[in-house]
Amino acid sequence: MKGSPFLENVSSGNVRMRTQDTQPRRIDSVSDDRFLTVGTESFAGIHLLLDLWDASGLDDADLIERALRDSIKIAGASLLHIHLHHFTPSGGISGIAVLAESHISIHTWPERGYAAIDLFMCGDTHPELAVPVLKNAFG
């Protein structure tokens, strides 16, 4: 997508991300199949990938679930189901929040202070608004 405003690299504090979109955006239309149109470009949704370093609370399933729920709410998405799996003995957690508009997944390595988070949302949602919620939850 050469010249597209939707692809850029961002580095902010302990969060490094490559994302299609980091700012609230104007959506020209949302089709019946939930595809977005901005200008002349149509796409399935907004995909954000977050790498959190020096993160904390990564072995706390309750904290992770709260962070997922809070980020879903602020993004304007609809939660269908959350499933978290706590690995032992390392304490890492992998989980997914299944949304009517797609998903948020998380994989944590508390022994390294690292979490990988994947947000994909279609329709009239704003996944970029979830980024500060997730940064604050694990910062």
Specify the residue positions occupied by each region the protein language model found.
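Polybasic/polar functional segments that serve as interface/processing modules
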Residues: 1-139
